[in-house]
């Protein structure tokens, strides 16, 4: 069996409310998330959505991480469109090489049995 080391997340954000006494400007939440600014805008990589029980819901890859992740919460064709409210935590790993992104995505989907991925699934 091939052993692939999954990279450690570069960024992890969770649902949170903005405190009234925060010195940061008021941020409009997107499905409970207000920290999208922490996700790199022009970097490629993989991302994982988890629920509050740390169950892997979805794995994806992107050339531009922030844009793609936000799109999952906005568009009507996302595989998680009916499950957006389940997402509690987002982990992001910056991976520059497109081939490596593809390998990591497929590997994570199949070894960690993501709940809502429908493509690249070999474990069902």
Swiss-Prot record:
* Database matches in CDD domains: GIY-YIG_UvrC_Cho (cd10434)
Which InterPro entries does the record associate with it? Answer: GIY-YIG_endonuc (IPR000305), GIY-YIG_endonuc_sf (IPR035901), GIY-YIG_UvrC_Cho (IPR047296), UCP026568_excinuclease (IPR014527), UvrABC_protein_C (IPR050066)
Q: Which GO terms describe its biological process?
A: nucleotide-excision repair
Q: Locate the GIY-YIG domain: which residues? A: 42-118
Q: Which domain of life is it from?
A: Bacteria
Q: Do you know which SUPFAM superfamilies this protein is assigned to?
A: GIY-YIG endonuclease
Protein's name in the database? Uncharacterized protein YurQ
Q: Which organism is it from?
A: Bacillus subtilis (strain 168)
